[in-house]
Swiss-Prot record:
Protein name: Probable amino-acid ABC transporter-binding protein HI_1080
Native species: Haemophilus influenzae (strain ATCC 51907 / DSM 11121 / KW20 / Rd)
Superkingdom of the source species: Bacteria
Function: Probably part of a binding-protein-dependent transport system for an amino acid.
Subcellular location: Periplasm
Main location: periplasm
Length: 257
């Protein structure tokens, strides 16, 4: 009964960000300031980017805004290049990363994550005229434009590709257009959004891995109480259809399951 009443409270209104027992340092600061500091790129559409009016928006941005709203917190975004994102978290420049980041085994050794709030997969992008790359194996010895610390970059390196380090997806795709890179591995949803915005890009998805990689919010280890709060709200947003609604607004279908 207590669990039911708590879930109902989550579904119908905001939850007070109450005092935690055994709270971490970040949770203590958030409780005092009532402000959540969020690390995000702001350049990775459709997850985190600026619209035509200059407003920071995107799927990940709107999900964490809704979570913060339910917790009775204000949100302050700290825009950061991807390759500096986890360094920023380590330095406590922000409390959490909201940037389509997945809890890989390597990251789980150093960081803690919420339950997933969406699922996507990896694809290889090449020029439309290039039919020589049809799998990860075909990347061996080829030039692949990747963020140095991303999982996609590690996948490309594992496949034997020559890595051209870039800041993000947009730069990767530009290098392919220019002929300076032959391919890139990235998130399928981000690539499809780019194609939607640039229908004459001259690029294509050369290979779709067909996987469903989970995405979650990343925290420093030791913030279990704060993560528990996040997980409770995410579950409530899943139950009342809010997560699905946000997903449909951005993608036309549900990516949260």
């Amino acid at each position: 009964m207590k669990k039911l009443l708590f879930t109902t409270a989550l579904l119908t209104g905001a939850i007070a960000f109450s005092t935690f027992s055994h709270a971490g340092e970040i949770a203590d600061r958030v409780e005092k300031t009532k402000t959540l500091l969020v690390g995000t790129e702001g350049t990775y559409a459709p997850f985190t980017f600026h619209d035509k009016s200059g407003k920071l928006t995107g799927f990940d941005v709107e999900v964490i805004r809704k979570v913060a709203e339910k917790l009775g917190l204000k949100v302050e975004f700290k825009e950061t290049q991807w390759d500096a994102m986890y360094a920023g978290l380590n330095a406590k420049r922000f409390d959490v990363i909201a940037n389509q980041t997945n809890p890989s085994p390597e990251r789980l050794k150093k960081y803690s994550f919420t339950t997933p709030y969406n699922y996507s997969g990896g694809v290889i992008v090449t020029k439309s005229s290039d039919n020589s790359i049809k799998s990860f194996e075909d990347l061996k010895g080829r030039k692949s434009a990747q963020s140095a610390t991303s999982n996609w970059g590690k996948d490309a390196k594992a496949a034997g590709a020559q890595i051209l380090v870039v800041d993000g997806l947009a730069q990767s795709l530009e290098l392919i257009k220019q002929g300076r890179a032959e391919a890139t591995i990235n998130d399928k949803l981000a690539v499809l959004d780019y194609f939607k915005q640039h229908p004459n890009s001259g690029l294509k998805i050369a290979y779709d891995r067909g996987d469903k990689t989970p995405t979650a919010f990343a925290f420093l280890q030791g913030e279990d109480a704060l993560i528990t709060k996040f997980n409770q709200v995410l579950e409530a947003l899943r139950q009342d259809g809010t997560l699905k609604q946000i997903s449909i607004e951005w993608f036309g279908y549900d990516i949260t399951q």
